[in-house]
Amino acid sequence: MKLHYVAVLTLAILMFLTWLPASLSCNKALCASDVSKCLIQELCQCRPGEGNCSCCKECMLCLEALWDECCDCVGMCNPRNYSDTPPTSKSTVEELHEPIPSLFRALTEGDTQLNWNIVSFPVAEELSHHENLVSFLETVNQPHHQNVSVPSNNVHAPYSSDKEHMCTVVYFDDCMSIHQCKISCESMGASKYRWFHNACCECIGPECIDYGSKTVKCMNCMF
C-alpha cells in the first residue's frame, strides 16, 4: 500500500512539473529529482504565501544547495521568469579526483558511433572565451555540497604558446542529471565536467586548463 502511495505521489509530482509553463516555472531539469524526494518525504507541504511556514526550515534543509534554484518548484518562493535567465546560461563544474588521461584520449580519438559529440579547440580559445555564463563550483570537501560562483579571472596553469595545445571535450547527446553526468565523465577518464542547468553534460579532457567550453552543444538537449 505504501509503495502504491509513493508511486502515485511521484507520478503526480512529475505531471505537475510538466504542466508548469516553460517561461514561468521552476528549472525542471535541475530540480525534478530533489523536489520529488522532498515532496515524497512530505517536507515541503506548507504554504508560506498563505501564512503557513511550519515546514519551511525542513524543506530548505532537504533541498540544501538547490534551495535558491528550486524553492519555486515547491511553492516556497515566488516563481521566476526563466525566459530572462535560461538554464543554458548557468552551469555547475567540478574537478574529478581520479582522471585517467590515457582512457579519455583513447575514447575520443577518431570518429565514434556512440551517443556523444567530440569537440576540440585551442586552449588559448578556452581561456579567452568568456560568455555571459554563470558557473558554480561543486565542492566535495563540505558536509553538504555547496555551489559557489567561479570567478572570471581564475589563475590558470601556464602553458607554452609556441605549441598549439588543444582542449578536447565530449558532449553527450541526451539530457541527464548532474549525478549521471559526473558518473559518465568519471567512467571515460575525464578530468572535470560541466553540467549545464538545462541538463546538458560536458566531459572535459586532461589537456584543458579551464573548465572546457561554455557553450551548450548536446544534440538532443539544447534548451
UniProtKB/Swiss-Prot annotation:
InterPro entries: Tsg
Signal peptide (from-to): 1-25
The keyword Kinase is annotated on this UniProt entry: no
Subcellular location: Secreted
GO cellular component, one term: extracellular space
Keyword Glycoprotein: yes
GO biological process: regulation of BMP signaling pathway
Sites carrying sugar chains: 52, 81
Sorted UniProt keywords: Developmental protein, Glycoprotein, Secreted, Signal
Pfam families on file: Tsg, Tsg_N
Domain remark text: The N-terminal domain is sufficient to interact with BMP4.
Similarity comment: Belongs to the twisted gastrulation protein family.
Function per UniProt: May be involved in dorsoventral axis formation. Seems to antagonize BMP signaling by forming ternary complexes with CHRD and BMPs, thereby preventing BMPs from binding to their receptors. In addition to the anti-BMP function, also has pro-BMP activity, partly mediated by cleavage and degradation of CHRD, which releases BMPs from ternary complexes. May be an important modulator of BMP-regulated cartilage development and chondrocyte differentiation. May play a role in thymocyte development.
Subunit structure: Interacts with CHRD and BMP4. This interaction enhances CHRD/BMP4 complex formation. Interacts with BMP7.
Protein name in the entry: Twisted gastrulation protein homolog 1
